[in-house]
UniProtKB/Swiss-Prot annotation:
GO terms for molecular function: calcium ion binding. One of its GO terms (cellular component) is centrosome. Ca(2+) 3 binds at residues 136, 138, 140, 147. Residues 21-39 have a biased composition (Polar residues). Ca(2+) 1 binds at residues 61, 63, 65, 72. The lineage of its organism: Eukaryota, Metazoa, Ecdysozoa, Nematoda, Chromadorea. Gene3D superfamilies: EF-hand (1.10.238.10). SUPFAM superfamilies: EF-hand. Residues 48-83, 84-119, 123-158, 159-193 form the EF-hand domain. Residues 1-41, 194-229 are annotated as: Disordered. Ca(2+) 2 binds at residues 97, 99, 101, 103, 108. Residues 194-217 have a biased composition (Basic and acidic residues). Keywords: Calcium, Metal-binding, Repeat. This is Uncharacterized calcium-binding protein B0563.7.
């Protein structure tokens, strides 16, 4: 299922914000993540968040001093998918660097990561809404099979057979359309995962689709003509 979702969302590449790299684990990061955290931090973040933040923090705290500089923090923010301009990143840092000493301790780092992730989430939600409107030509709140196939063929270089196969796999309720929630799940899956996967339809057209799209993205205009009934 996931591979087909990737195939649908790949045609939205030009709108897609860059996703952050996966946080690598190391023995050093694992040791630090198992250390006890201050109680107030444990109340603000989930155990999973603290583990990921600690691993990422340790990647940049190379001297083990317990603090990182602003430049390292910027790189950490970018690595989780926040591709804002310098002024926006500086504003986030200014908000979390409570003592203003230009060094970020782990507690400040956690606050910055959480804020950055919220910004990325908001950006992704706006992206999903815009993409849904591109497919939903008649603005009735659902994407019909004809609407899906039209966009997929016109701007994703799908042929009829591949477009139909992908739609049928995504239409898990088999009612002939995709709801806004279903579409959001498809695009969120694409934004959060590596798009370099094949569509598992068992058809040679899939490989040709991947070959055509490895090095370029399909343009997505702001306005499209009416989809044929």
């Amino acid at each position: 299922m996931r591979s087909a979702k990737v195939g649908v969302a790949r045609q939205l590449e030009t709108k897609k914000p860059q996703t952050g790299r996966k946080i690598s684990t190391s023995s050093r990061g694992t040791i630090h993540s198992q250390q006890s955290q201050p109680e107030d931090i444990q109340m603000k973040y989930t155990r999973k968040e603290l583990k990921e933040y600690r691993q990422l923090f340790n990647m940049f705290d190379t001297d083990g001093s317990g603090a990182i500089g602003n430049e390292e923090l910027k790189q950490a923010m970018i690595s989780i998918g926040l591709h804002a301009n310098k002024a926006e990143i500086d504003n986030v840092i200014k908000e979390v660097d409570a003592d203003g000493n230009g060094e970020i301790d782990f507690e400040e780092f956690c606050a910055c990561m959480k804020k950055s992730q919220n910004i990325v989430k908001s950006t992704n939600e706006e992206l999903i809404r815009e993409c849904f409107e591109i497919f939903d030509q008649d603005r009735n709140g659902i994407i019909t099979e004809n609407e899906f196939k039209y966009i997929a063929k016109e701007f994703g270089d799908f042929d009829d057979e591949l477009a139909e196969k992908v739609f049928r796999e995504l239409d898990v309720s088999a009612n002939g359309h995709l709801s806004a929630d279903q579409f959001a799940t498809i695009v969120e899956d694409y934004l959060l995962n590596d798009p370099k996967h094949d569509i598992d339809t068992g058809d040679s057209d899939v490989e040709r689709y991947d070959d055509r799209h490895d090095d370029r993205a399909s343009p997505m205009p702001n306005h499209l003509s009416t989809v044929p009934e």
